[in-house]
Each structure stands twice: as structure tokens, then as C-alpha cells.
């Protein structure tokens, strides 16, 4: 048997890693400590997304599924959610936050996920786990609406609504990083640290770039404690990657605090946007160390541009959070 390789005629690249809303909600869930999300739908709705995360971050992540089958589509799959919550809490005694993430199939069927959560709170949790802190959060993310970008938005909104409380401000700012990499979170923390600004990093993924340890004790888990969302209500909000976050709107409206939005800074070139905004809200001057770092970055760009990029036109595509930061300087 012979094999003939044919080159395709297209000159563009099709990006397969731009999927539906449940992916965004799952990304939020893995950024919360002691949290495992249950995707209420077919197994593929979680397996594909978990594969995306594992291939990109080269780490393993814990996500569960209600494993919806044909009989559930006909007779109703709410019982699968109840069983999934029971099994999950029994197998993982440290789990405290369980988002119930809907999919296209369960939304079309019309499953009353909010009603199931109320039933579980009044029944299973009191009877089988009476002394345990468990938070069940409904996240409605039908796949036929929006994308993984808006799914992240919806999940942020639901977590904020569930946990955050109106209390006295603590003069911190909130940082919603969006679809970024662990190194980006580390860099954003560096910026804030240089400016001596205290911040709550919500749905934090810096630990996804976890080191290899001989005893295997270091694993990748989100670093945002669910009680950290209580503090979310107490402080002004900080510009998150895009200008569309419902979570930003919810927190700002309910606690009457300021909200700002900006493109995510990509490395140092966009320092001209980032430092100005915390300075406006915090009143602290931009340190010379950041001005120096930005100058070095711009100098490196200038050194390369005239050699390789002069009179060139390029197309930048990808997640909006990343593309805006790359292109807008």
C-alpha cells in the first residue's frame, strides 16, 4: 500500500481551540482552590476541554461529568446531577466548591439545575454531609450562545454573586486575568508588586506552571480561595482583560465601587496603559524600575523591527484577551 501526501491549497490556519461556553466555565473552576466542576452533559463536553487544558499547560486537571446519555435526554437527566454530586463529595473530602456547568443538550431539554441545587442543599448535603462546607453553584452556559470567552464571563459573574458580600472596603484591587498563561499572572503580580499595590488575584492560575517534585507533592490547582471572593466585595475593581465582563458589572453595581477595563498588557510594551490605571485608583506613582523595563522592551522591539519586520503586514489571531494586548501598542 502506498501513501501519497497532498499539500492543502489554503494559506491560512484553522484554529481548533476556540470552543463553546462550558470551556470558559471550566477554566474558571480550575482556578478556584478546593473546587471541582461538574459538567452537566455528555462526557465529551468535559473530556475535550480537559484535553485542551492538559495539552496546553502540560498538567492534569480534575473536572467531572454527569455523563448524560440518551435515556436522560428522553426521561430527564436531573438525577445524574444528584448522583454526580454525591459521588464527587464522597471521593474528594476536601472539595468545597462544586459548580454545576450546563451544556447545549441540558439547556435545550430545560433541566432545572437551580431546582436540583436547592433540593441537594435541603436534602443530600444536610443528611449525608451535615458538618461539611459545600457550595453548589449553577452556571448556565449553553453551547449555542457565545463562546469560551463569554463562558468565562458567565462563570465569573455566578461565582461573584454566590460568594461576594457588601462590607467595608479594604483598599485592595481585584485582578481578573481572563484567558492567560501562568507566566502572565506572575508578570502581572510583579507589576503590582513594583507599584506597591495590594491586589486579590481571582481565579488565579500561576501554580499551573508547577515544578516537578520528587515526592509528587506539588500539583496544579487554582489558588483563589472561595473565601477570597468574600473580600471581592470589599474593594475597588481593577481593569480586567476585556471590556465586557458581567462579573465586573455585578460586583461594581452591588457594592457601588469603581470598575475599569483595559486590554491585557502583553509583556512590557503596554505599560503605558497598565500603570496609569492603578495610579488613578491608588494614587501611587509609577516606579522608575517599570519605566526602565518598558524602555528595554521597546528598545528590543526597535532593534528587531528595522531588520525583520520593516514594511511587513501581519495577521494576529487568537483569544481576544491575548490579541488585544499583542496588537494594541
From Swiss-Prot:
Region entry Disordered, spans: 213-288
Residues binding [8Fe-7S] cluster, per UniProt: 20, 45, 104, 143
InterPro entries in alphabetical order: ChlB/BchB/BchZ, Nase/OxRdtase_comp1, Nase_comp1_CS
Statement: the UniProt record of this protein carries the keyword DNA damage: no
Catalytic activity entry: N2 + 8 reduced [2Fe-2S]-[ferredoxin] + 16 ATP + 16 H2O = H2 + 8 oxidized [2Fe-2S]-[ferredoxin] + 2 NH4(+) + 16 ADP + 16 phosphate + 6 H(+)
Enzyme class: oxidoreductase
Co-factor(s): [8Fe-7S] cluster
Xref: Pfam families: Oxidored_nitro
Cofactor binding notes: Binds 1 [8Fe-7S] cluster per heterodimer.
One of the protein's GO biological processes: nitrogen fixation
Biased composition (Basic residues): 257-271
Gene Ontology MF term list: ATP binding; iron-sulfur cluster binding; metal ion binding; nitrogenase activity
UniProt KW keywords: ATP-binding, Iron, Iron-sulfur, Metal-binding, Nitrogen fixation, Nucleotide-binding, Oxidoreductase
Gene3D superfamilies: Nitrogenase molybdenum iron protein domain (3.40.50.1980), Nitrogenase Molybdenum-iron Protein, subunit B, domain 4 (1.20.89.10)
UniProt-listed Enzyme Commission number(s): 1.18.6.1
SUPFAM superfamilies: Helical backbone' metal receptor
Superkingdom, taxonomy of origin: Bacteria
Keyword Iron-sulfur attributed: yes
Role summary: This iron-iron protein is part of the nitrogenase complex that catalyzes the key enzymatic reactions in nitrogen fixation. Other nitrogenase complexes utilize a molybdenum-iron protein or a vanadium-iron protein.
Complex and partners: Hexamer of two alpha, two beta, and two delta chains.
Family label: Belongs to the NifD/NifK/NifE/NifN family.
Protein name in UniProt: Nitrogenase iron-iron protein beta chain
